[in-house]
């Protein structure tokens, strides 16, 4: 049991740690914004727990799928294994719909319950709304990651995470400060860079 907990727990911890890199990188860049950097940092601080909750739900669902899928494959029952994979993707779709609805209707209520600073509320709402509405990247990446691990291809999930993080690091200054033809978007730019990185990770694993 202890060995199983380690095998399943360590990848989950590493995944959450790597996903936290997105918020750390975003915070580093918005902290250097010419206007409103303090409010932006406060906004990201309020948003971070919700982001990690989405990551935890996605990874938790993936870990359960991983265990069941590995069991079916070990038994040579490929038909049930395919059904498990399909059900996990359907569940991922339900999780995304919940995040989408929260992004549309619940984000401002949540941020407003944490602060009375109107600038922080505006920035936090903008950032979190984008992350929730385009959360399919992080949700399905978490599921694809565990599906690959169950089939012994964990290296691909690591590559996907690294690619997503690199995409985020590259896009952050471009979209936050406005470089070349890209307009300055501030906190919204940080959010878009994050979700693009997450979608890139998920797309890479899907391919």
Regions from the PLM with identified roles:
Residues 79, 92, 147-174, 188-195:
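Alpha-helical transmembrane segments of multi-pass membrane transporters/permeases
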Residues 41-101, 138-157:
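Small-residue-rich hydrophobic transmembrane alpha-helices
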Residues 21-24, 32-33, 38, 72-75, ...:
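Helix-loop interface residues and adjacent transmembrane-helix termini in multi-pass membrane transporters
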Residues 2-21, 25, 50-57, 133, ...:
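Residue-level signal for short hydrophobic patches within transmembrane helices
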């Amino acid at each position: 049991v202890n060995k199983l907990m380690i095998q399943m727990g360590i990848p989950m911890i590493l995944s959450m740690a790597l996903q936290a890199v997105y918020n750390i990188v975003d915070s580093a860049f918005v902290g250097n914004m010419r206007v409103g950097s303090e409010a932006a940092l406060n906004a990201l601080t309020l948003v971070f727990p919700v982001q990690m909750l989405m990551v935890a739900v996605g990874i938790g669902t993936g870990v359960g799928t991983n265990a069941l899928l590995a069991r079916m494959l070990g038994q040579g029952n490929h038909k049930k294994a395919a059904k498990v994979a399909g059900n996990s993707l359907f569940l991922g779709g339900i999780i995304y719909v919940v995040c989408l609805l929260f992004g549309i209707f619940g984000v401002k209520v949540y941020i407003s319950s944490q602060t009375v600073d109107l600038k922080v509320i505006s920035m936090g709402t903008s950032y979190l709304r984008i992350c929730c509405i385009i959360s399919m990247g992080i949700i399905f990446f978490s599921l694809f990651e565990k599906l690959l691990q169950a089939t012994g291809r964990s290296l691909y999930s690591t590559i996907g995470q690294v690619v997503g993080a690199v995409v985020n690091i590259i896009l952050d200054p471009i979209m936050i400060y406005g470089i070349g033809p890209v307009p300055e978007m501030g906190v919204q730019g940080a959010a878009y860079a994050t979700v693009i990185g997450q979608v890139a990770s998920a797309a890479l694993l899907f391919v």
